[in-house]
Curated annotation (Swiss-Prot):
Keyword Kinase: yes
UniProt effect for mutating D261A: Inhibits cell growth
Chemical reaction(s) catalysed: L-seryl-[protein] + ATP = O-phospho-L-seryl-[protein] + ADP + H(+); L-threonyl-[protein] + ATP = O-phospho-L-threonyl-[protein] + ADP + H(+); ATP + H2O = ADP + phosphate + H(+)
Lineage: Eukaryota, Fungi, Dikarya, Ascomycota, Saccharomycotina
Protein's organism: Saccharomyces cerevisiae (strain ATCC 204508 / S288c) (Baker's yeast)
GO BP annotation list: cell division; maturation of SSU-rRNA; maturation of SSU-rRNA from tricistronic rRNA transcript (SSU-rRNA, 5.8S rRNA, LSU-rRNA); negative regulation of transcription by RNA polymerase I; negative regulation of transcription by RNA polymerase II; positive regulation of rRNA processing; regulation of exit from mitosis; regulation of kinetochore assembly
Keywords: ATP-binding, Cell cycle, Cell division, Cytoplasm, Hydrolase, Kinase, Magnesium, Metal-binding, Mitosis, Nucleotide-binding, Phosphoprotein, Ribosome biogenesis, Serine/threonine-protein kinase, Transferase
InterPro entries reported in the protein's UniProt record: Kinase-like_dom_sf, Prot_kinase_dom, RIO-type_Ser/Thr_kinase, RIO_dom, RIO_kinase, RIO_kinase_CS, Ser/Thr_kinase_Rio1
Post-translational modification: Autophosphorylated. Phosphorylated by casein kinase II (CK2). Phosphorylation by CK2 stimulates RIO1 kinase activity and targets it for degradation at the G1/S transition of the cell cycle.
An annotated GO cellular component: kinetochore
Bias kind Basic and acidic residues: ranges: 442-461
PROSITE patterns assigned: PROTEIN_KINASE_DOM, RIO1
Name of this protein: Serine/threonine-protein kinase RIO1
Biased composition (Basic residues): 462-484
Length: 484
C-alpha cells in the first residue's frame, strides 16, 4: 500500500472533536458579546494631552470651567496674570453682565464687550492641580469639623477642590462679619475662585504690605497695631486663625489693611489652632521689628488675642479703632533681653487647649470656685507652665541649693514623721506662687549632665577591672556542664 492510500485511510473521531469544542465554548462563553454592535460610542482613551498645562494652572479641564463662567455671564474676559504663588496663580478679569454673551452670526464668535472702566474688576484665583508644589495641606484640614467628610489627600484634584471651597467659605465669613476688610467672594467652581479685585486704577493691583511705601514712622506703628487688632477680631468674631499671616498676605487698599489668602485658615477648635496663632504672632513681630519699631512680647499678644475680656477696656470689642487705641496705650513694649528670652520659652511651650492637657488637681480648683470659666483655667495653666520654665532658666542654681538643704533636713527626721509628711503632701495642693520645677534629663543643667556622664564612665571602668573575661567564662561554664 502506498503512502497516499495510508493517508486517505486515516480518520478523526467526530466525538472527540465535539468534546474539545464544547470545553472551549464553556471556558470562553462569558467573554463572547452577543448584543448588537454599537458604532455611536467611541473608545475612550486617556492621553497626556488631556492634562497639558500652561502657566502651571491652565489645563483643558480648567479652561472648560472658565468657559462656563463666560457663558453664564459671571466674567466677560480673562486678562493677564497678576501674581504667582506656591498654590495658585491670580488673573485679572472684568465682570460679566450676568447674562449669556451674544454670539456674532457672521463670525460665530462671542461679541467683545467694550470696557469703559465702569464695570467691576475681578481677581480669578486658579489653584494648581497637575503641578503641585504645596503638598503639605493635611495638617490644615485634619480635625476641621467643616471638612470631616470630604477629605481626599490622595487625589490632587479632589483635594484642591476642597481647598478652594475652604478659602471661599473663610473669605465669605470674614467679609460678612464686617470687622476686617477683605475682598468680596463672588463664586467658586472646582479649582477656580472668583473674588473682588483690589485695584489702584488702570488695572494695577494695590500693593502688598511688604511693598507699601510708608509715609512716616507713625504709619508703621499704625499698621502694626492694626495687624494685632485683626488677629483678635479674626479669633473672637470670625472664629478663625489665619495660620499664614504675614506682610505677604495683607494688602493696603484705600489706606486700609485688607486680609487675603485665607485658604489655610482654621477654626479655634482645630487641634493646632493655638500653634498656628503663635506662628502668626511671630511672623508679624519679625516683619515690624525689621522695619525698626518697638514691638510687643509674643506672649502678651497671645493673651490679648484669646482673652474674652480686656482689662481697662470700655469701648466696643468689634470696633477696630477702639482696639488700636487700646493696644497703643496699654500693651507693654519688649525692651530687655529677658523679654527676648521669655519669647523663646513661649515658642517652645506646650499650650493646653483641652481637658486632656489638664491635671486632676486643676479640676479640684475649678470645683472649689477659684476659676469661673474653663477657658480661664486653661489660660492659668499656660501661665503656670510659662512661669515654671522661666524660673528654671534663671534661678536654677538657687533651686539646687534649696533642694539640697531640704533633703539634708529630711534625713535627720525619724521614719514615722517622714511617713506622716508624705501622706500630707499627697493630699495637699500646690501653691500658685511656687513654680513647678521641670524634671527629667531634657531639662538638666549642662554642667550636671557632663558630671553625671563622667561618673557613669568611671563606674563602668572600675567594673571592667574585676570583670571575668569572656573566654574564661565559657571554659568555666563548659567544665560545670561536663561534671554534671
Amino acid at each position: 500500500m502506498s503512502l497516499e492510500d495510508k493517508f486517505d485511510s486515516l480518520s478523526v473521531s467526530q466525538g472527540a472533536s465535539d468534546h474539545i469544542n464544547n470545553q472551549l465554548l464553556e471556558k470562553y462563553s462569558h467573554k463572547i458579546k452577543t448584543d448588537e454592535l454599537s458604532f455611536s460610542r467611541a473608545k475612550t482613551s486617556k492621553d497626556k494631552a488631556n492634562r497639558a498645562t500652561v502657566e502651571n494652572v491652565l489645563d483643558p479641564r480648567t479652561m472648560r470651567f472658565l468657559k462656563s463662567m463666560v457663558t453664564r455671564g459671571v466674567i466677560a474676559d480673562l486678562n493677564g496674570c497678576l501674581s504667582t504663588g506656591k498654590e495658585a496663580n491670580v488673573y485679572h478679569a472684568f465682570a460679566g453682565t450676568g447674562k449669556a454673551p451674544v454670539i456674532d452670526e457672521e463670525t460665530g464668535q462671542y461679541e467683545v464687550l467694550e470696557t469703559d472702566g465702569s464695570r467691576a474688576e475681578y481677581a480669578i484665583k486658579i489653584y494648581k492641580t497637575s503641578i503641585l508644589v504645596f503638598k503639605d495641606r493635611e495638617r490644615y484640614v485634619d480635625g476641621e469639623f467643616r471638612f470631616r467628610n470630604s477629605r481626599s489627600q490622595h487625589n490632587p484634584r479632589k483635594m484642591i477642590k476642597i481647598w478652594a471651597e475652604k478659602e471661599f467659605r473663610n473669605l465669605k465669613r470674614i467679609y460678612q462679619s464686617g470687622v476686617i476688610p477683605a475682598p468680596k467672594p463672588i463664586e467658586v467652581k472646582n479649582n477656580v475662585l472668583v473674588m473682588e479685585f483690589l485695584s489702584r486704577g488702570n488695572g494695577f493691583a494695590s500693593p502688598k504690605l511688604k511693598d507699601y511705601p510708608y509715609k512716616n514712622r507713625d504709619e508703621i506703628f499704625h499698621y502694626y497695631h492694626t495687624m494685632v487688632a485683626y488677629m483678635r477680631l479674626l479669633y473672637q468674631v470670625c472664629r478663625l486663625v489665619h495660620a499664614d499671616l504675614s506682610e505677604y498676605n495683607t494688602i493696603v487698599h484705600d489706606d486700609k489693611l485688607y486680609m487675603i489668602d485665607v485658604s489655610q485658615s482654621v477654626e479655634p477648635e482645630h487641634p493646632m489652632s493655638l500653634d498656628f496663632l503663635r506662628m502668626d504672632i511671630k511672623n508679624v513681630n519679625l516683619y515690624f521689628e525689621k522695619m525698626g519699631i518697638s514691638i510687643f512680647p509674643e506672649r502678651v499678644i497671645f493673651q490679648f488675642v484669646i482673652s474674652e475680656t480686656l482689662e481697662k477696656f470700655k469701648g466696643d470689642y468689634n470696633n477696630i479703632s477702639a482696639l488700636v487705641a487700646y493696644i497703643a496705650s496699654n500693651l507693654p513694649i519688649k525692651s530687655t533681653e529677658q523679654d527676648e528670652a521669655e519669647d523663646e520659652i513661649f515658642r517652645s511651650l506646650h499650650l493646653v487647649r483641652s481637658l486632656g492637657g489638664l491635671e486632676e488637681r486643676d479640676f479640684d480648683r475649678y470645683t472649689d470656685g477659684k476659676f469661673d470659666l474653663l477657658k480661664s483655667l486653661i489660660a492659668h495653666d499656660n501661665e503656670r507652665n510659662f512661669a515654671a520654665s522661666e524660673q528654671f532658666e534663671f534661678d536654677n542654681a538657687d533651686h539646687e541649693c534649696s533642694s539640697g538643704t531640704e533633703e539634708f533636713s529630711d534625713d535627720e527626721e525619724d521614719g514615722s514623721s517622714g511617713s506622716e509628711e508624705d501622706d500630707e503632701e499627697e493630699g495637699e495642693y500646690y501653691d500658685d506662687d511656687e513654680p513647678k520645677v521641670l524634671k527629667g534629663k531634657k531639662h538638666e543643667d549642662k554642667d550636671l549632665k557632663k558630671l553625671r556622664k563622667q561618673e557613669a564612665k568611671d563606674a563602668k571602668r572600675e567594673k571592667r577591672k574585676t570583670k571575668v573575661k569572656k573566654h574564661i567564662k565559657k571554659k568555666l561554664v563548659k567544665k560545670t556542664k561536663s561534671k554534671k
